[in-house]
Structure formats: structure tokens, C-alpha cells
Amino acid sequence: MNPLLILAFVGAAVAVPFDDDDKIVGGYTCEENSVPYQVSLNSGSHFCGGSLISEQWVVSAGHCYKPHIQVRLGEHNIEVLEGNEQFINAAKIIRHPKYNRIILNNDIMLIKLSTPAVINAHVSTISLPTAPPAAGTECLISGWGNTLSSGADYPDELQCLDAPVLTQAKCKASYPLKITSNMFCVGFLEGGKDSCQGDSGGPVVCNGQLQGIVSWGYGCAQKRRPGVYTKVYNYVDWIKDTIAANS
């Protein structure tokens, strides 16, 4: 994440005592089409990530909210038209009603696509979790965020990072009095690997289920400052109810 206090996968600045951080540091270039649920949120340029959870719905971070968003699916190199992309405007953008921009609690939003996505080898959905994330589970984090812990280098190609879920005790010890029951940590206490600016809103997938949303952190890939993620399991009912009410 940033050398400053930051939000670990955010695209636009947020007026909070954190700095936006939405990139992958210490990862690797994803194999093309290996993360078909990953989307890019665009408002003239990429600013956040997201995850396709049904043909017409995307989940992202609440701090990624903008009034007008184009969702770009099937992307790998976001600077090149590769022929597999689907660009679909948002019809509805619904941030969690209890989203708190100061502490980033309930950092989640849903985006309804104006037309359903075409599901194929390049674009597909990711399952919602059936149980909360267990400590020690290896997860895949992906995004087009900054790849440097100091300075800036934004990749054109989607980046991936394999990282473990940390215990809630280690998460709370890393950020005293800042971790709510709706947050969890993924990463390495020794630093060197993390999400960062530009990754915000993107997926944390563990055992084939969307367990996390890139939310915030202090800097990127700093020692004893792992990335903090929205715990999707806590919002499964809200997601299902919101989709049903807006179908």
C-alpha cells in the first residue's frame, strides 16, 4: 500500500484518515482469463476493481462509489482492446446503507449492469461465501493497482497475489481499535506483498468463493500492516435482499 495511511484497494480519494490504496505489490501477472470474475470500474480510466456475482450484478467497495460507472468485463490488459471485453454501464449503484466513510465499516456496494453480461470463457461469475474465511486459508487477490510499496507503477496487465487469511487477533493487533467484525486481514506480517492503490473494490477469493473486498490498510506491503478486507460473508443476506428488491 502507500507509504501513507491508505485504503488498500481504492481508486478515488476518500476524506478519511487513510490514503487510498488499491494495487498489488509483490505479486505476479495473472494468467490471461484465469480471473474471469474480475472487473474494472471505469470513469474515463480505471479507478477500482470489482467482482461479477451474477449476470447483472457486481460487488465492489463502498469507498469506490461514483455516480456514473462503466463496468469493464473480460479485461486483462486494460490499455489494449483484446477482443474479449464487454463494456456495460451501471444502471444502479447501491452502497450499503450503513457504510461509514470514516472507519470504512460496511465498505461494500452493489452495481446493477444496464444489460446482463454474456458469460463465456473470459467472463464468468464468482460464488458468494457459505462460511466465513478461516485463518490460514490461502486466497487469491487480484487487481490493476500500484505494484510499488514506495512510488508508483501501475500495470496494464492484471496482477495476482496468493496470500493467507490472518487470525482476527493478529489483524486487531496490527490495527488497534480499528478492526470491526465486518473486516478481516489477509497478507504477510513481514511485509513485501500486499494490495495497493487501484486494487480497491477487487476480489479476495478463497477456495472458489468471494470472501473479501479490497478495502483499506496503512501504506502498501509494510511490516505488521497487512491489507484489510470487507468480510463478504456478513453481507450475503443484504446482497441477496438488495438484488431481489432491484430485479
Swiss-Prot record:
GO biological process, one term: proteolysis
Subcellular location(s) per record: Secreted
Domain of life of the organism encoding this protein: Eukaryota
Residues covered by the Peptidase S1 domain: 24-244
Example of a GO MF term: metal ion binding
Site (Required for specificity): 194
Signal peptide, first to last residue: 1-15
InterPro entries: Peptidase_S1_PA, Peptidase_S1_PA_chymotrypsin, Peptidase_S1A, Serine_Proteases_S1, Trypsin_dom, TRYPSIN_HIS, TRYPSIN_SER
UniProt: Ca(2+) binding residues: 75, 77, 80, 85
Reaction(s) catalysed by this chain's protein: Preferential cleavage: Arg-|-Xaa, Lys-|-Xaa
Entry's Gene Ontology cellular component terms: extracellular space
Pfam families reported for this sequence: Trypsin
EC annotation from Swiss-Prot or TrEMBL: 3.4.21.4
Family per record: Belongs to the peptidase S1 family. Tryptase subfamily.
Annotated protein name in UniProt: Putative trypsin-6
Organism: Homo sapiens
Lineage: Eukaryota, Metazoa, Chordata, Craniata, Vertebrata
Gene: PRSS3P2
